[in-house]
Amino acid sequence: MQFDYIIIGAGSAGNVLATRLTEDPNTTVLLLEAGGPDYRFDFRTQMPAALAFPLQGKRYNWAYETEPEPFMNNRRMECGRGKGLGGSSLINGMCYIRGNALDLDNWAQEPGLENWSYLDCLPYYRKAETRDVGENDYHGGDGPVSVITSKPGVNPLFEAMIEAGMQAGYPRTDDLNGYQQEGFGPMDRTVTPHGRRASTARGYLDQAKSRPNLTIRTHAMTDHIIFDGKRAVGVEWLEGDSTIPTRAAANKEVLLCAGAIASPQILQRSGVGNAELLAEFDIPLVHELPGVGENLQDHLEMYLQYECKEPVSLYPALQWWNQPRIGAEWLFGGTGVGASNHFEAGGFIRSREEFAWPNIQYHFLPVAINYNGSNAVKEHGFQCHVGSMRSPSRGHVRIKSRDPHQHPAILFNYMSHEQDWQEFRDAIRTTREIMHQPALDQYRGREISPGVECQTDEQLDEFVRNHAETAFHPCGTCKMGYDEMAVVDGEGRVHGLEGLRVVDASIMPQIITGNLNATTIMIGEKIADMIRGKEALPRSTAGYFVANGMPVRAKK
């Protein structure tokens, strides 16, 4: 089998590349995905409100676990990643948040990455998007990814929480992806107008999968990339339960889009990475790149939960006797409780003046429950998910064997810096202040978690150690740049090799201020044009907010 391009991983970036490259009818593409199809009849991945279900099993989730995290009471922590067509866009929380403009401007400070500034990237965010209320300078109107906005009257808690943020002195913003990210406001989501999850399998592959020049193989577990000297010339993988490898040749390039956990694993198994690590497993060294698998970053978050004094939360939706009606409303009408992910409001703030752009993110949820559906509070409640955005902590991903089925050693080193602890203490105290504003007086009951007895720095720190969880945003393990730990250049090409790129969240040099899916899709769109030799889309002229020393919040 021979193809022009072989793409490893049908996720948030891989599906973008597969779709854009096959727009050229003479270009042949093989798309390899270790998981299965995105079964459209499976409510677990298609119903927005069911977002916790895919995380509970292993059909759609790699269900990685970290090594014992030394600063988190040695907990082994969840590290869920999507498996199947759509990748993590098939199992994520569907929050469409691009990050802050200054995140990208910060990337572009590095020599060689100048064309990754916000205004250079904004046209690619727009290209990917169809927003339900139409296009403008910040949003697209005819892209593959369906984005919906929050509508008034969904749940009174959303507006009350936004109002409480304003009463605490923080700004309101009507578009967290528009002119100003900083502040509290409604949250856009990757959901179709018919109430279905808008993964990249639905948005991109649906338009491409019937093309004769695109071949899609599911249940295809990549073993390694094949090299001829320093050039990537093909891929070897295992199909289904087979132990006999299948091979295909890439006439032009191999495009690695397996994500922040799997992409460095595949490079390491293929002989690209830290020479000492590869020697440990008798893997012949193709090219030494010490940065492969390093620079691992994530967002850590915790839940502050409150009893709700009025019966307006989603608690009744958790009762089994209400679920058939909710399911029918969603299935036949694409409406009702099932048609929303219920992360319809949130915000970004600076916890201290020293931060030039927001360092704390909020997601508001009108029910008290863990993200993976566990530990639901058995009463009406609501919660804030809150966490820091740009932790200085760094971890790694390293293979444990040559077996592609064996999970790697993953260590985030969460909370390894004093800045982390200061930010989380600030976050808890600020959240409590917001939750005690007049806008929430009629709803707010007792504090369920952490509980009012948790007040001192030591008590807050212990709560974080025991209860903070991943926001499922790993990135950075094949970072873009030109220093000694960089893995790819500004076009995703692996340093020192030919015919090989990495295109996914692993190439982010620094984690962004917000959820990763939208930016991973943008990366796919931008590098697709580079691969095709197309001129970059014209740089945007849209304005964007810079705090520039403004106070963190207004004085009361």
Swiss-Prot record:
Q: According to its UniProt record, which cofactors does this protein need?
A: FAD
Can you state which reaction this protein catalyses? choline + A = betaine aldehyde + AH2; betaine aldehyde + NAD(+) + H2O = glycine betaine + NADH + 2 H(+)
Give the GO molecular function terms.
Answer: betaine-aldehyde dehydrogenase (NAD+) activity; choline dehydrogenase activity; flavin adenine dinucleotide binding
Which residues are listed for FAD binding in this entry? 4-33
Q: Where is the active site?
A: 473
Q: What is its EC number?
A: 1.1.99.1, 1.2.1.8
Gene3D superfamilies (UniProt xref): FAD/NAD(P)-binding domain (3.50.50.60), Glucose Oxidase, domain 3 (3.30.560.10)
Write out the pathway annotation from the protein's UniProt entry. Answer: Amine and polyamine biosynthesis; betaine biosynthesis via choline pathway; betaine aldehyde from choline (cytochrome c reductase route): step 1/1
An example GO CC term for this entry is: membrane
InterPro entries in UniProt: BetA (IPR011533), FAD/NAD-bd_sf (IPR036188), GMC_OxRdtase (IPR012132), GMC_OxRdtase_N (IPR000172), GMC_OxRtase_C (IPR007867)
- Keyword annotations: FAD, Flavoprotein, NAD, Oxidoreductase
Q: Does the keyword Translocase apply?
A: no
Q: Name one GO biological process term.
A: glycine betaine biosynthetic process from choline
Q: Which residues form the signal peptide?
A: none
Function comment: Involved in the biosynthesis of the osmoprotectant glycine betaine. Catalyzes the oxidation of choline to betaine aldehyde and betaine aldehyde to glycine betaine at the same rate.
Give the UniProt family note. Answer: Belongs to the GMC oxidoreductase family.
- From the Swiss-Prot or TrEMBL record, give the protein name: Oxygen-dependent choline dehydrogenase
Source organism of the structure: Escherichia coli O127:H6 (strain E2348/69 / EPEC)
